């Protein structure tokens, strides 16, 4: 793998540095929305923690000078009274103790509020990510670049907003301290401030450059990171572990996992060694400048220009000032890095969303049913000229009370047609009508209420049995009567009632006391889920009985025909025993409808359908 692209050599390390801070304001706004009182508390504690160190240094000077004066007074007094001599100094010591206590209280307040905000903000950002996911189209989810964006956002962005805010308040605290220290240092010499800045600036420039390098590396290798996560899932999930063990894949996948880690670790190690080496070398400059100033203050004190207390104060102020400035510049560099990572979050949140402009709840021609008019579909991306459509020039009409069966090889476009019907995809060309109105003009909610679908790759929710049914109609999610009714239609009620907790039984192995079902039982659960929508007049079954035995399959379709008598029924199946009773059969090959008609008519035509039917029938002889 080639190294990540670097910035142009002509650009400076700080090129575009401050431009990236556009996300700081949004992060602060996010924290304000999460808890304005905690943010105000952070501001107050920051102010206290920023001002009081300089006050403590000034009081420290007064204590040292007070001790020197008390010693001289006590030594020169004719009738020395120790209590009288030390009382003013002890008051100053008590005052400094109070200041230190307030600083400790402010620091504890900062720590407590940051800890609480971390939990609140992490939850808020994760909810934002998941809410955004709910607005994205299926086509966007099938885009690997969006998955990379989502992976980057979820890995870092939930912690970065608070980190950015903490650094912002830390910067404010250090800036206040620096201002306070600056007032004291200027009394010594304005050059002292210049020395302070000059000592910390090289480290800041270095950190800014390496923060940008780390971020570019992070973005560039998202696919490798996603592969690591995928391999972890495959090796540790019950739905994949059977094949992993049977095929002996542990060693193969673990080695691939290790290889990816080794590659990523080597990149991290190179960057870390360069970053820390330069940080050490440039940090030595700061140390040298500090001790140069240290010597300067000592010389001035020996020369009599400064008192012992002033020397103590200036040394303390210079040391704390250097630490505060270094922390400030490091915070700015860290804020830069946090802003870079937050760009992942906002790039994801700003993904364009297909406008839901449809408002219709009733079509222009009620009862007309479904119409596909010259519908073609190509997946987005790639060369639109060279890319073959997945579906090409599909036209059909299905009236209420009619059934349609789709027949064809795997990958012929059958399931894609269903995704177009349910508006998971939009046609590239042509249009789909429901009751005489374009599908895009319908309200999404109204369309969902009219459609009951079971896909071949249905979801096996690690929830209770009843909840697995309830997801079919969220308005009746907790309605036990509706669960039972749907389960009877889907032939799941028999085995559900035999379970220990009935409809309250936990399914799957992810949670305690969960029960796993057979493939056929899961299909009955999914079928029952499709029947949850009482008002659905479009029923779609995509290979609904692939894991069922012949007797169960026959009963399922007998009930399906009864249930869908006055509805529009669409069935995808490779079993001709189930499709032969459909009012209309479409044979699809490579996205084209090559044959259409009833079972008898297609047999008379003696085309592809007849050939496939005879092949399957031969297997039963």
Predicted regions located by residue number:
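Cytosolic ends of transmembrane helices, especially the final helix of ABC transmembrane type-1 domains
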Residues: 220, 249, 273, 293, ...
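Membrane-integrated ABC transporters
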Residues: 1-53, 70-92, 106, 110-114, ...
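Conserved catalytic Walker-motif region of ABC-type ATPase nucleotide-binding domains
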Residues: 133, 257, 372-374
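Hydrophobic patch in the ABC ATPase nucleotide-binding domain
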Residues: 138, 351-354, 492-496
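ABC-type nucleotide-binding domain
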Residues: 358, 363-621
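Transmembrane helix-loop-helix hairpins at lipid-water interfaces of multipass membrane proteins
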Residues: 39-109, 181-214, 288-295, 299-308, ...
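Cytoplasmic coupling helices
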Residues: 112-134, 138, 196-236, 255, ...
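An intracellular "coupling" helix at the cytosolic face of ABC transporter transmembrane type-1 domains
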Residues: 33, 154-164, 217, 223, ...
